[in-house]
Amino acid sequence: MSNPRHNEREVRSPRGDELNAKSWLTEAPLRMLMNNLDPDVAERPHELVVYGGIGRAARTWDDFDRIVATLKTLNDDETLLVQSGKPVGVFRTHKDAPRVLIANSNLVPHWANWDHFNELDKKDLAMYGQMTAGSWIYIGAQGIVQGTYETFVEAGRQHYGGNLKGRWILTGGLGGMGGAQPLAAVMAGACCLAVECDETRADFRLRTRYVDEKTHSLDEALAKIDAWTKAGEAKSIALIGNAAEIFPELVKRGVKPDIVTDQTSAHDPVHGYLPLGWTVAEWRAKQENDPKAVEKVARASMKVQVQAMLDFWNAGIPTVDYGNNIRQMALEEGLENAFAFPGFVPAYIRPLFCRGIGPFRWAALSGDPEDIAKTDAKVKELLPDNKHLHNWLDMAKERIAFQGLPARICWVGLGDRHRLGLAFNEMVRNGELKAPIVIGRDHLDSGSVASPNRETEAMKDGSDAVSDWPLLNALLNTASGATWVSLHHGGGVGMGFSQHAGMVICCDGTEDADRRLERVLWNDPATGVMRHADAGYDIALDWARKQGLRLPAILGN
């Protein structure tokens, strides 16, 4: 029996200004869906896997074909509904409604666990959408680079006087998200040793210039890190190995990194974490044949790694969970103090969220890198005083290789996002850009996620697990006229631990797009300021007042 999720075909997004659909509002999701499965973008495109363990773009290849065919014929007063990667309906709406509404991996809370999801998954009744895999706005490892860079820079400010020169970061995982870490570290001025069990992933990061070197030897890796830090160089190396073995070995040797974190796919104990002592081939085979055995040994292995991270923390080394839920897995395995070290959001990122600042991103549907160069210049023009952002854009231009359609990630917030969107739309209208632009973001944003072990960890008012906020975010983006809106469960940290929403909007150069952009790109980050103001953060309260937000129960207006 053939596997409906495996096909050797190669998918790449169309380029240029010729339409394959009836309008750019349907061409945009078509191209971004296909871009998610570009072999230069996706982790395992032949299996529909984009990143993050089993984060898929469509449920089966037949469903992918149905989505593509439907988008090509969809009218501008119709909306396609996608249920866990399956196109289930087309309904008459109106021109300002989203062209696509997506719900992925959502389960009633009592059943929201990996065991139940995996049962549904085997029957082709569900699909894990991760965050940007099933919402068709993944742009490769660049999508997380700036957030990781901001995290490392803030860690440098807090712990090392704002200077990471001559220091190094230990981490694990070089997948779709973790692959950003070495480059982000180097951009922040540090060296990086990244442990990765799957050599093909390390090779992918080498090919796309996200990591500088590769080795199979821990001794060689440490020697290079030592030489680079002494010389004040910022370079990175991938070590082929198992983080659950390497981290404890470094503790045993008394090696002291300057920062420790991890971005293995620990959120998925079957498909995301190599058990200690296993080969990758053995692991892949047993994922299908004996997933319970894989999960049992993988969880025990995570406990070993987290214990090593605790040892680093107790030695005074800044250590953070980078949002893969590895502490939770270790806690469930009996490591009672697994949460002694913090997550990266409460440690370094939350003040940005309080101002609605997060991972704003855009992609050039033309496929021409020059369109991104022009939009980069426009960002600098509109935000002339943000030198930190200018520095990021300069480094991104120099260091980041585009994957698939050219794209840019750029952390900006409430008050700036809508200005950039309107400017990009004007550039499309006057012909400065060769084709429309799509603007989206990660689901990891200030108002679009409830994830008590990651984005909403340790909220000031204890509202970590309240998931009304991402639901309201999705509803508001739908009402505001985003081109497509998504609502997912389990991204980043796994089943039962998160709910989150995404949006993408197309700049097609029309005046209708101006109105939609102004609404969506104001309202979307404003929900983040609202959420944090409601939790009692002074930064958010002040920003809400400054931006004139009307928050009756919060500001009394």
Swiss-Prot record:
Q: What is its EC number?
A: 4.2.1.49
The pathway this protein participates in, as annotated, is: Amino-acid degradation; L-histidine degradation into L-glutamate; N-formimidoyl-L-glutamate from L-histidine: step 2/3
Question: What residue spans carry the region label Disordered?
Answer: 1-20
Per UniProt, where does NAD(+) bind?
Answer: 52-53, 130, 176-178, 196, 201, 242-243, 263-267, 273-274, 322, 492
The record's comment on cofactor binding reads: Binds 1 NAD(+) per subunit.
Q: What keywords appear on the UniProt entry?
A: Cytoplasm, Histidine metabolism, Lyase, NAD
Q: Does the keyword Ligase apply?
A: no
Q: Where is the active site?
A: C410
Q: Name its co-factor(s).
A: NAD(+)
Entry function:
Catalyzes the conversion of urocanate to 4-imidazolone-5-propionate.
Know the name of this protein?
Urocanate hydratase
